[in-house]
Amino acid sequence: MTSFVLASASPARLAVLRSAGVEPVVRVSGVDEDALIAALGADAAPEHVVTELARAKAKDVLPVLARDGISDAVIVGCDSMLLIDGALQGKPGTVDVARERWSSMAGRSATLLTGHSVLRITEGAVVGDAHDHSATVVHFASPPDADLEAYLATGEPLQVAGAFTLDSLGGWFVDRIEGDPSSVIGIGLPLVRRLLADVGVGVAELWATSGRGD
């Protein structure tokens, strides 16, 4: 059976895959995102940035899989960033930065871009490479100051792209979205399905043995 390797430490991405019948092998990439973004240049299109980050993450775990003896697998790498006012925003990292971002996006709309990369390896060699991005418009509410401060205090928005989540506490402050919900969470199932097809893999081949596939 082909292994499904998730090149991410994201609990949200893992949860999406598990709910969709896939039990991934998790191998976290060590890509220096800031260095790669700098290398791409200030004029790089936002869609190109997130896609190249996803590709780098998928490729980065190849030596780890070789070390671990995983020679037949599909590797999925993802990267999400929020595009607002023409600028890409990743993880805020601190309460002050998250607060500043919420002050600029409350009551407004922004686009969550998620780059996706799928590599297929057979007998240790890359035999398939597909990549693309998804774009979902997110319409934000204007949370009262007390609610926003309470949200910031949880720490949840500090380590997620755009300083919000859709599937957890941050969902209270999202009025609606236009696009794929799973992409906003971090891994778009419709896009991953298409990329898997591009490298010759059907999703049912990857379902965990639970009555849904074998």
UniProtKB/Swiss-Prot annotation:
Keyword Cytoplasm among UniProt keywords? yes
Q: Where is the active site?
A: D79 (proton acceptor)
Which cofactors does the annotated protein need, by name?
a divalent metal cation
Cross-referenced Pfam families, in alphabetical order?
Maf
UniProt KW Cytoplasm keyword: yes
According to its UniProt entry, one GO biological process term is: nucleotide metabolic process
Q: Which reaction does it catalyse?
A: a ribonucleoside 5'-triphosphate + H2O = a ribonucleoside 5'-phosphate + diphosphate + H(+); a 2'-deoxyribonucleoside 5'-triphosphate + H2O = a 2'-deoxyribonucleoside 5'-phosphate + diphosphate + H(+)
UniProt cross-references to SUPFAM superfamilies, sorted A to Z: ITPase-like
This protein's source sits in the domain of life called Bacteria
Q: What class of enzyme is it?
A: hydrolase
**Classification via InterPro entries:** ITPase-like_fam, Maf-like
Keyword list (alphabetical) reads:
Cytoplasm, Hydrolase, Nucleotide metabolism
Task: Please give the Gene Ontology molecular function terms for this protein.
Answer: nucleoside triphosphate diphosphatase activity
E.C. code: 3.6.1.9
Report the GO terms under cellular component: cytoplasm
Q: Which family does it belong to?
A: Belongs to the Maf family.
What does this protein do, in the record's words?
Nucleoside triphosphate pyrophosphatase. May have a dual role in cell division arrest and in preventing the incorporation of modified nucleotides into cellular nucleic acids.
Q: Which NCBIfam families match?
A: maf
Output this protein's name: Nucleoside triphosphate pyrophosphatase
Q: Which organism is it from?
A: Rhodococcus opacus (strain B4)
